[in-house]
């Protein structure tokens, strides 16, 4: 007989969670995070100060999705309470880079002496602060913050050169919650 898979997540103080029509919303001091969560055979319930993610089936896919949804929900609640922050370092040897935030775009000028600026997208409600040789990417959605930092790092990737010698770029040096 198949056994039921059940994960219980406690809701921290100051966070309100609602689940209606397969959309989970978590509100806290930093803002509101919403996410569409639906998978066949996986149920989500909000009961008072806890969230129950369960599945009547113990198949591999349902078990994996219960764990995935549990992680997504805990990250949503961490984001609205503490937020996520990535620290990045600007490294150059000969040509000094000029970096600036222009609306929802992150602009890198004079990378390796290039005339054309490199432009990276800032996703969602993520904020980017550039000062000197440090870039701070912060927000309440872990996926948007991480993808924005990765986009910036990838825009300064040097192709067809040895990365041990040509180390110019913008690199992630620290991740904080």
UniProtKB/Swiss-Prot annotation:
Pfam families: Ribosomal_L6. SUPFAM superfamilies: Ribosomal protein L6. Keywords: Ribonucleoprotein, Ribosomal protein, RNA-binding, rRNA-binding. One of its GO terms (cellular component) is cytosolic large ribosomal subunit. The keyword Nucleus does not apply. GO terms for molecular function: rRNA binding; structural constituent of ribosome. GO terms for biological process: cytoplasmic translation. The keyword Transport does not apply. This protein binds to the 23S rRNA, and is important in its secondary structure. It is located near the subunit interface in the base of the L7/L12 stalk, and near the tRNA binding site of the peptidyltransferase center. Belongs to the universal ribosomal protein uL6 family. Part of the 50S ribosomal subunit. This is Large ribosomal subunit protein uL6. It comes from Methanococcoides burtonii (strain DSM 6242 / NBRC 107633 / OCM 468 / ACE-M).
């Amino acid at each position: 007989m198949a056994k039921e898979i059940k994960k219980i997540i406690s809701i921290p103080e100051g966070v309100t969670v609602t689940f209606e029509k397969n959309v989970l919303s978590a509100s806290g001091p930093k803002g509101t995070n919403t996410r569409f969560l639906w998978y066949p055979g996986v149920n989500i319930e909000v009961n008072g100060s806890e969230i129950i993610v369960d599945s009547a089936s113990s198949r591999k896919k349902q078990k994996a999705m219960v764990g995935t949804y549990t992680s997504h929900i805990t990250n949503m609640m961490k984001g609205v309470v503490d937020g996520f922050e990535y620290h990045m370092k600007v490294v150059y040897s000969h040509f000094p880079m000029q970096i600036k935030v222009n609306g929802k775009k992150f602009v890198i000028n004079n990378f390796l002496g290039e005339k054309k600026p490199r432009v990276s997208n800032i996703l969602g409600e993520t904020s980017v602060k550039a000062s000197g040789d440090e870039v701070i990417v912060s927000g309440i959605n872990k996926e948007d913050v991480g993808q924005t930092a990765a986009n910036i790092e990838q825009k300064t990737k040097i192709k067809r050169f040895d990365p041990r010698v040509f180390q110019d770029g913008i690199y992630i040096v620290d991740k904080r919650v």
